[in-house]
Amino acid sequence: MKIKIDSLDNIHAAAKKFLQNMGDGKVFAFYGKMGAGKTTFVKAICEELGVEDVITSPTFALVNEYTAGNGDPIYHFDFYRIKKIDEVYDMGYEDYFYGGNLCFLEWPEPIEDLLPEDCTKVTITVEEDGSRSVEF
């Protein structure tokens, strides 16, 4: 599936479309260059799920936990600064990835060997006109 985001004005419509088409998946790995909009898109998805917390990139915390409107936890990861895979083992990644709750992962490249088999890979691309394409 491919979703086009022309501007920030329609990012919530794109997030709704993503949610309508994401299936039963729980773990989503977001790929894209720096500045492609991974955090912005995850933020819009979380807002559409009823998260009222301030949603930020967990670059330094590694993981942020939010509460969806239905009370379920949502986990937002950023693996950009991972230096050693042991850091991911130490945080107990299996509890998150296999716990049955939504997990949104930015910069998953350093931990690809640990991703669940049913992880959905989402690629955000900056198009020549400045719009974004979200493919999954």
Regions found by a protein language model. Name each.
Residues M1, E47, D86-V88, E94-F136:
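Short phosphate-coordinating micro-motif centered on Lys-Gly-acidic
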Residues L19-G25:
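Phosphate-binding P-loop
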Residues F28-F30:
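Hydrophobic anchor at the beta1->P-loop junction of P-loop NTPases
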Residues K38:
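Conserved lysine of the Walker
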Residues V51-Y66:
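Short beta-strand-centered segment that lines the nucleotide-binding/catalytic pocket of NTP-utilizing
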